[in-house]
Each structure stands twice: as C-alpha cells, then as structure tokens.
Amino acid sequence: MEANAGSTLAPVNYSDDNVAKPLENQPVNFYSLTLEDLKAYIKSKGKEQFRAQQIFKWVYEQRVTDPEQMTNLSKEFRQDLPSMLSFDLPPVLQHLKSVDGTQKFLFDMKDGMSVEAVVIPSEDRLTLCISSEVGCNMACKFCFTGKQKLKRRLRTEDIVGQFMQVHDRLAEGQRITNIVFMGMGEPLDNPEAVFKTIDVIHSPWGINLSRKKITVSTSGIVPEMWRVADAKVRLAVSLNGPNDEIRSQVMPINKRWDTKALLEACKEHYRVSKDKITFEYVLLKGITDQLEHARQLVKLVKDVPCKINIIPFNEHPGSGYERPDDDTIQAFHTELMNLGAHVLLRRSMGRDIFAACGQLTTVKERPQTMDISNSRLAGLPKYKRELLAAQEAEQNNQH
C-alpha cells in the first residue's frame, strides 16, 4: 500500500533516532539489523554476504551468540566478528508471575530507562505484549503509561531484545505464538523501529513468525496507519469512546484526528488488506459503559468490517476512573451482541501483578512486598487489595 501525499494516510516524517549509532570502530548491535542490513554491513567490511544468513540462523534458530560456536564460519571470520557485532540484550530487572499464568518482565534499557513486556497465556496461544516506547505522548486518561511523558522511542534492538529475553525464560515446550504491539508507548509514534522489528520477527531467517500472528495497536495516528497494511500485519485500534465528545475526553488524540478521519483510515486499511480491524473499547464506570453508548458504538463502526474487544477498566493508582460492576459489563456485552456486533469480552489477565491492559509503567512494581494482611483490606478482592496497597505505598513515597 503506497501513501498518497494528498490523502489522510500520507506518512509523517520522523527523524531516525531508531538506528543504532555506535562510536566509530565500535561493533553494531546485531539485534538492530534486518537480514538485508546485515548483508550490507558485512559487505562493507569486505566479507561474503552469505555469512549474514549463517549468523541469523545461529542466533535466531540455535540461540548461539558466541562466535567460536558458529562452526560453519571461517576461523578468520569468527575472530573478526566480536569487533563487528555485539549481541547485547536489555537486562531483565524483574520477572513476575501471576496466579493466572501471566508473566511480566521489566527491562533495563541501560540509559536509566526501563520498559515492560507481558506474556499472556490462553488455551491455544502464548501472546507477547511488547513495548515500543519509554513512556507515551498520547496521554490517554485511563492508561498508567499515558501518565508518563515520552522519554524516548525504543530502537529496533530494544524491541527485538524484549522478545529474545522473554523467549529464553519460557518453560520447556513453550513458545511465543503471537506478538502484539500493545505494551508501553504508541507503535505508530515510532514507526521506523516498529516495522523494522516486524521484518526481523517475520523473516524466515529471523524469528520466523507469520505476519498474521503480529498485531499493531494504535490510538489513532491516522497518517501512519497505511504502514500496517503495507507490512501485512493485523491492525487494532483503541477506540474507547462511542462518539467524538467522549473519545476526546479520554483520548486527547481525537482532537487531532477525530472518529471520522480514524474510521476512513480503517476502511482504507480493510480495502487494501481484507483483514478485519479489531476495535478495543475500555469500559469506564459512568463514562463509556451505558447501553446508549453500546448503541452509539455499533452505529459508529457499522461501515467497518471489524470485531470489538470490550476491556473492563483495570484500576491503577491515581487513575480517577473506576471499573464498572459485573452486571453493567455483562449488560453492555449483551447489548452489543443483540445489535449484531462481533464482540469479545476480554478477560483481564495479570491484574495481581499490574500487568493488565493500561497498567504498565517504567518502575518496579510492589506486589511481591505489598502488605495486604491489614484487616481493612481483607474482605476485598485480591486485585483491589493490591491496588489500595500500591496507592498507599505511592503516597508514602511522596512524603
């Protein structure tokens, strides 16, 4: 799909801060490179280009990064490789496991920054929810990450590195089957690194994951949405409001690209890709959860082949929003189904370790050390006890 400079889908120009820029005569991070990048780099060093496929296979298929173990490389090349390439990965600062099987990883970006990624299990898949930025510029009101201003966009090696570190910590027999760019940050605010990462993830010489198993989620950066169809991956859109008034209230991006522009881009995506769009809709008590909102939502998206994921709000310290009660959630779900919508009520996974949708942040969480024995909290659901304990800890840290 090519961008038309006169359409709403024309691309935005970004300064390329996503490519590794090593000091002169310093090795390049291997995970910053696609196969074609590595071929060109090796050629520039006077080496045979076919060595790139060999190295990719060693690293991504065999998980070997020690040049001395890459036995089909010449001795001379193995000796030269450490001066050409580094295989550094972002260290794992914290690895938490939920009672429901969800796992959360906190990564050190080595510059004082950190990001999180989440592994979500289900019957037939194991999904990695991956981050694309430290913080986020979108400032969605209900999102914990949105409270943090964008600190920096992740580079390709930062994103690929999340996958590699998670993969190497999975239980025997487990493997990542799906990847969703739904972690910290707005993927289409960092398109160069995100779509370069997708090239590595999809490459048969790389991670070798089908493009149909990769989903890019956006809050609605309309001029960049053409890239998702161009990459032949799936599109998810954070809608979260049944009309412009409510969506603008909870998602400031709607003031720049309203629902009309957003849905036109969605229709264009379907025209090119023939893939249904997934609309994500967070239920906020008293704001987006009424039956009239359900009716408005169905009317809003009626011309876009789609499915709707309903996500009951996951509370976090200082959010100012509440999760609707179960009866309200079920009534909203039923109303959508009665109106003929293809709808899924998403189960919130990992709430006890603050790994659910909208709860990711850049600091170590406290669930391992939270004191929830206080009798005042004892009668509450576990996730609510931990939320209140986290809020108290946050307040104590501010004093």
Swiss-Prot record:
Originating gene: rlmN
Reactions catalysed, as given in the entry: adenosine(2503) in 23S rRNA + 2 reduced [2Fe-2S]-[ferredoxin] + 2 S-adenosyl-L-methionine = 2-methyladenosine(2503) in 23S rRNA + 5'-deoxyadenosine + L-methionine + 2 oxidized [2Fe-2S]-[ferredoxin] + S-adenosyl-L-homocysteine; adenosine(37) in tRNA + 2 reduced [2Fe-2S]-[ferredoxin] + 2 S-adenosyl-L-methionine = 2-methyladenosine(37) in tRNA + 5'-deoxyadenosine + L-methionine + 2 oxidized [2Fe-2S]-[ferredoxin] + S-adenosyl-L-homocysteine
Cysteine-cysteine disulfides: 129-357
PROSITE patterns with a match to the protein in the record: RADICAL_SAM
Family from the record: Belongs to the radical SAM superfamily. RlmN family.
Gene3D superfamilies: 1.10.150.530, Aldolase class I
Principal place of residence: cytoplasm
UniProt cross-references to InterPro entries, sorted A to Z: Aldolase_TIM (IPR013785), Elp3/MiaA/NifB-like_rSAM (IPR006638), Methyltransferase_A (IPR040072), RlmN_N (IPR048641), RNA_MTrfase_RlmN (IPR027492), rRNA_lsu_MTrfase_RlmN/Cfr (IPR004383), rSAM (IPR007197)
Further information: Reaction proceeds by a ping-pong mechanism involving intermediate methylation of a conserved cysteine residue.
Subcellular location field: Cytoplasm
UniProt cofactor(s): [4Fe-4S] cluster
GO BP, sorted A to Z: rRNA base methylation; tRNA methylation
Enzyme class: transferase
Cofactor binding remark: Binds 1 [4Fe-4S] cluster. The cluster is coordinated with 3 cysteines and an exchangeable S-adenosyl-L-methionine.
Residues involved in S-adenosyl-L-methionine binding: 185-186, 217, 238-240, 314
Name of the protein this chain belongs to: Dual-specificity RNA methyltransferase RlmN
Top-rank lineage group of the source organism: Bacteria
UniProt-annotated binding residues for [4Fe-4S] cluster: 136, 140, 143
Role description: Specifically methylates position 2 of adenine 2503 in 23S rRNA and position 2 of adenine 37 in tRNAs. m2A2503 modification seems to play a crucial role in the proofreading step occurring at the peptidyl transferase center and thus would serve to optimize ribosomal fidelity.
Cellular component, GO annotation: cytoplasm
SUPFAM superfamilies recorded: Radical SAM enzymes
